Amino acid sequence: MAKDYVTGKKTTFGNKRSHAMNSVRRAWKPNLQKVRILVDGKPKRVWVSTKALKSGKVTRA
């Protein structure tokens, strides 16, 4: 999976736990969207998390 260009978020791994505390490996993926942003004044198409988009850490091109 891709990595967030701004915050560096990527897939994290851990265990899913049932009520009986049985464990199964699983992955948590960030909500990434491919958007055009301004990097050094030029538009660039990169993967950005929706959290970074909502918080205003990115200026769209």
From Swiss-Prot:
The gene is rpmB. HAMAP family: Ribosomal_bL28. The lineage of its organism: Bacteria, Bacillati, Bacillota, Bacilli, Lactobacillales. GO terms for biological process: translation. InterPro entries: Bacterial_rp_bL28 (IPR050096), Ribosomal_bL28 (IPR026569), Ribosomal_bL28/bL31-like_sf (IPR034704), Ribosomal_bL28_bact-type (IPR001383), Ribosomal_bL28_sf (IPR037147). One of its GO terms (molecular function) is structural constituent of ribosome. Residues 1-21 are annotated as: Disordered. It comes from the Bacteria. Belongs to the bacterial ribosomal protein bL28 family. Disulfide bonds: none annotated. Pfam families: Ribosomal_L28. The keyword Ribosomal protein applies. Keywords: Ribonucleoprotein, Ribosomal protein. One of its GO terms (cellular component) is ribonucleoprotein complex. SUPFAM superfamilies: L28p-like. This is Large ribosomal subunit protein bL28.
